[in-house]
Regions:
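Pre-Walker A-like glycine/lysine-rich segment at the N-terminus of P-loop NTPase domains
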Residues: 1-60
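C-terminal lobe/lid and adjacent interdomain/linker elements of RecA-like ASCE P-loop ATPase modules
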Residues: 1-4, 297-366
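Phosphate-coordinating catalytic segments in nucleotide- and nucleic-acid-processing enzymes
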Residues: 4-8, 18-20, 67-272, 347, ...
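DNA major-groove recognition helices of helix-turn-helix
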Residues: 58-63, 320
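Post-Walker A helix-loop "phosphate-sensing" segment adjacent to the P-loop in P-loop NTPases
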Residues: 61-73, 277-278, 305-307
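Short basic/glycine-enriched coil/helix segment immediately N-terminal to the Walker B
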Residues: 272-280
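Walker B catalytic acidic pair
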Residues: 285-287
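Conserved D-loop-proximal element of ABC-family nucleotide-binding domains
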Residues: 289-293, 297
Length: 366
């Protein structure tokens, strides 16, 4: 699980912003939102322009250089804070991987090239690469001086994590393997004017074709009914069909034509839910942009029941309720800071509090 993330000089974040998930409160309700002492589920709120999208994408920067998973083509446009174009963007990650704490820090130039990189496991420095200087644990990773010098120079700006992964035989439980597996399972996506995603998959799919090919037509029909109350009757697909058809009084009408924007968004969500059994960390940006507030609540319940860490961003304060999460799982992002509700007030928050009403009444200060 990811327990802490920090970034500096990234897009709109001129100063360092820290998102700490490692200190949940001791609430006795909705305990499923906490796992192994770490916040497992959460929703990020904040005014327009506060940086919710930027924070989500910043967390997933690590996917760009540690995996071969799908990447956002224009990610490095507007990558660095406009007022400090010559500086580096600094990233800090802390993971809880089994019983080990893994800290991974790195810096990138404005074009995304990796400049500095450091890995610490349980307070032991595995390597520390700053510019052309490299300190590395040669007991764990024995190497010839020429090989070490090549790593230090790193003319191709390749991650040392990846070099070690490909150069040494490591057992499955090794911390580098666990780190790789976690990052491989990270997924960010959104569905606004266009559909975009980062991580988890290497391919792009046509949703109709995927649902038909996987034999999920009936399950998708049931999903729409349970989550949104919409009752579609899909035509049983023939061999080689690639388009979902709905039966309307004997007429076959393409689902794509009659589905609303919100229903199309649900279709994308359904697709990703099929993939989330192998996910480790999911961030859905503006997940409910096209959802009725009650539908958004039902979708959240389904997402937060998954085994992986799931976070969303939203403007829908109907979701800010102790019936869904807890005060330590609702975050406010404002003025280059992100804090949970319980850290934004001196009042003791309890299950019976109407935290949405308190939020609208400006009871929480970041």
């Amino acid at each position: 699980m990811i327990t802490r993330f920090a970034v500096k000089n990234y897009r709109g974040f001129a100063d360092k912003i820290v998102w700490d998930l490692s200190h949940p409160s001791s609430y006795s309700f909705n305990t499923n939102a906490i796992k192994d002492g770490v916040v497992k589920n959460g929703i990020i709120y904040g005014p327009n322009g506060s940086g919710k999208t930027n924070l989500g994408m910043a967390v997933f920067d690590i996917v760009n250089h540690l995996t071969q998973k799908f990447k956002k083509a224009d990610y490095y446009k507007n990558f660095i804070y406009a007022g400090r174009q010559d500086n580096l963007v600094d990233f800090e990650y802390t993971f809880k991987l089994g019983e080990q704490e893994v800290r991974y820090d790195y810096s990138k130039a404005r074009d995304g090239k990796l400049i500095n990189e450091k890995l610490v496991v349980d307070d032991n420095v595995v390597f520390d690469h700053q510019g052309k200087n490299l300190v590395i644990d040669t007991k764990s990773f024995p190497m010839e001086p020429t090989f070490k010098e090549g790593l230090a120079q790193n003319a191709n700006h390749v991650s040392i994590v990846n070099v070690l992964l490909t150069s040494y035989p490591l057992v499955e439980g090794h911390y580098l393997m666990k780190l790789k597996n976690f990052v491989d399972g990270m997924l960010w996506f959104r569905n606004l004017d266009i559909r975009e995603f980062i991580g988890l998959e290497t391919n792009v799919y046509v949703l109709d074709e995927y649902i038909i090919k996987k034999g999920l037509v009936d399950d998708f029909q049931s999903f729409l009914a349970k989550v949104s109350g919409q009752k579609f009757t899909f035509v049983k697909p023939e061999k080689n069909d690639k388009v979902l058809l709905c039966d309307y009084n004997g007429e076959k009408i393409p689902f794509d034509i009659i589905a609303s924007t919100g229903t199309h968004s649900l279709m994308l969500l359904y697709f990703w839910i099929q993939k989330m059994d192998k996910a480790t960390l999911v961030f859905i940006d503006e997940f409910d942009a096209f959802y009725h507030f009650e539908l958004a609540f039902e979708v959240c319940k389904r997402l937060f029941a998954l085994e992986c860490q799931v976070f969303t961003s939203s403007h829908n304060t109907y979701l800010m309720t102790n019936d869904l999460l807890r005060p330590d799982c609702n975050f406010i992002l404002k003025n280059n800071e992100i804090k949970s509700l319980c850290d934004c007030t001196e009042k003791e928050l309890r299950w019976g509090n109407n935290i949405e009403k308190m939020y609208r009444g400006k009871a929480f200060e970041v």
